UniProtKB/Swiss-Prot annotation:
Stored Pfam families: DNA_gyraseA_C, DNA_topoisoIV
Sorted UniProt keywords: ATP-binding, Cytoplasm, DNA-binding, Isomerase, Nucleotide-binding, Topoisomerase
Subunit structure: Heterotetramer, composed of two GyrA and two GyrB chains. In the heterotetramer, GyrA contains the active site tyrosine that forms a transient covalent intermediate with DNA, while GyrB binds cofactors and catalyzes ATP hydrolysis.
Family label: Belongs to the type II topoisomerase GyrA/ParC subunit family.
Gene designation per UniProt: gyrA
Enzyme class: isomerase
Entry-linked SMART domains: TOP4c
GO cellular component: chromosome; cytoplasm; DNA topoisomerase type II (double strand cut, ATP-hydrolyzing) complex
Protein name: DNA gyrase subunit A
Source organism (scientific name): Deinococcus deserti (strain DSM 17065 / CIP 109153 / LMG 22923 / VCD115)
Positions annotated as active site in the UniProt record: 118 (o-(5'-phospho-dna)-tyrosine intermediate)
Entry keyword annotation includes Membrane: no
Domain Topo IIA-type catalytic: 30-493
Highest rank taxon of the organism: Bacteria
InterPro entries tied to this protein: GyrA (IPR005743), GyrA/parC_rep (IPR006691), Gyrase/topoIV_suA_C (IPR035516), Topo_IIA-like_dom_sf (IPR013760), Topo_IIA_A/C_ab (IPR013758), Topo_IIA_A_a_sf (IPR013757), Topo_IIA_dom_A (IPR002205), Type_II_DNA_Topoisomerases (IPR050220)
Amino acid sequence: MTGIHPVDITSEVKTNFINYAMNVIVDRALPDVRDGLKPVQRRIMYAMLLEGLYSNQKHAKSASVVGEVMKKYHPHGDSSIYDAMVRLAQWWNMRYPMVHPQGNFGSIDGDPPAAMRYTEARMTKVAEELIADLEKETVDLKPNYDETTEEPSVLPAAVPNLLINGATGIAVGMATNIPPHNLTEICNGLLAMIDDPNLTLDGLMEHVTGPDFPTGGRITKTGIREAYATGHSGLKVRGKARIEEKNGRNQIIISEIPYQVNKTNLIQTISAMYKAGKIPDISALRDESDRKDPVRIVVELKRGAIPTLVLNQLYKYTQLQTTYTVINLSIVGGEPRVLPLLNTMQYFLDHRADVVTRRTRYDLRKAEERAHVLEGLLKALDHIDEVISLIRGSNTGAEARDALMVRFGLTEIQSQAILDMRLQRLVGLEREKLQAEFDELQKTIEYLRSILGDEKLLWREIKKEIRAIRDNYGDERRSTITELEEDIGKEDLIAVEDMVITMTKAGYLKRTKLDAYRAQGRGGRGSSGGKLREEDVNTRVFVGSTHDYLLFFTDQGRVFHEKIYDLPEAGRDAKGTHIRNLLPSLREDENIASVLSVGGFDEPGCFIFATRKGVVKKTLITEYGNITSAGLIAINLQPGDELIGVGIVNDIDHVVLATRNGKAMRFESDEVRATGRATQGVIGIRLREGEDDAVVSMALVPGGDEASELLAVSECGLGKRTPVGDYPAKGRGGMGVITLDVTEKTGKLVTLARVAGNEELMVLTEKGTVIRTRVEEVRVTGRNAQGVKVINIAERDSVISAFPIRREDEL
């Protein structure tokens, strides 16, 4: 027989990989739910215990600790052991460090530690609580890797290390990411669980409010309960920053950064975002961190910069805001499990109950053994002369021991203790001391037996120890729990600025900073305002804030909206973007009838609509807050009707409707009852049957100001200005009064608009001619007049559109 056995490679690989995976999961990467330590961390603590590196002793070379661990317990290379030891010492990684470092143990900037031959270490005071009572047989020992010695399978862990320091690890096919917590809160939660075995998660969260990171920061409350209920969730963590003013400029001081964020990387990201134009208002960036302020990053801002806006940009584009993914995975009974918070804490309490029980049994055994010895010593002292005589008469120690056992009924242990007793113990004072010790031991034995016999006393002992841990090591929270913070949206990253919005007859739209218009100053020659085709012209020019909504109402009764900051920004000479590229849901036969800007949909007031057939409708602005990219029905139109204008009114405003045949109807807006969004409206002006008439304009008169003027322009280029007071305010639904004496000379009415007198009048003709004149040059005449020649029209040409726009020097 050769000794070579053929095996199936598939099953062999599967078996070996499973064994490897479980070895990594259980023996390397994941912490035990009881002491919160991975095997390498536990071995480091045990080695430091054996070397006597307590918190009150001298530091020892890190290399000696690493060597001891690698030699006896962890044969996986010195670098992994030293890396684990270094992490246990780093304040920015451990909420309660377990190793007290001396020398260079790295930095929050990601600097590596010095070599282990240069650094020294010892345990911290709180680390001693992990190994307390280890010598009292409180945990099971197991053989080390080569079976030359033993190591603990778990530490007694008087502190809830898994929760106060958290854990991070990547195994095969799984990972753990447990956040650190505040020791005081965890201890209070444990005490509450002992007092109320049926404590709910909400009751527990009255004590444990959330994670507490060593680097501080702000944790959003949303997600914490889910993490505690399921063991898995995401937490939004922000660094802490404040805004200060220095030398007339604002600066942002970052004093705390999110957990596990590298400070140098954060600074580099801020610099990169500035260069990329994401955070343009930074003028200087400095790292002023020192021993007093471990984290102090100064972000100086340019003059005029809005600090809250820059801070939002820092949260959005840098690691100043991160998401911490909670995966509460640990080893339970030799298997990996994701646990809710209550279960994690209960496993710790069960572990402490087991440790305290085993310690009590050990202490009881030792107390009973000592009491047994003292009982023999006291009996010997009561018969000291006889004992001395008996011992002197014996030839050997064994003979003396046997004689004592026979004469006084002692055990072998008691007899040997008498023989080992020094002569000075024979004095009377020593007997009193022995008696006092014996009496005290009897009380101790009684107390220890009561703990083992009464579960309530056991838990009372555990509570006493938890309180002592809390009182000795508890501290204030470093991280702040905040209520829900809105996600940083696009609007939070854009400054509030005034913009000039222009739209041309051909449908090109753009926004330009108002400063670009004002920079020229009054009295200049002006500029084109855009590189337009000869037949194109700006038909709408108005000022709005970047955070305002721009509403586009179509002639088919639909409405679209865009934030002004979403419009293409361009210089004064640029053409802009076509409206159909901005609103792809526009139908081919659908055109923009009106454009309005609003600050939001919670504003007071109503939209008022006018149609070609004389219908008006009024609807609250709040009805339009759910406009989608596909548009929304703004008004239901009758067949053959179309929307010609939309405005914003309050109840004291007046409305003037004008028709092609020169009729105008003025009425108060409160005569139109506000109705729902998808309604048809009511008659505003009645058109005479049989006549080719239609509404061409709607003018709004704020507060019914009769001193303001209405500008009328006809097809043949005649125009006039007429005071609003010349138009009687009649109830809606009538046929109106004459606003223009329409004749063959004037042609039909093209537009009627309210003007202030400082606008420019833009006139477009059928053959593409664009004429621009000042409104103030149009004569003021009566309502029944035909007006005067505003522009000269070529033969066989006519005006198709006329509208006042704000002059550039009035923006």
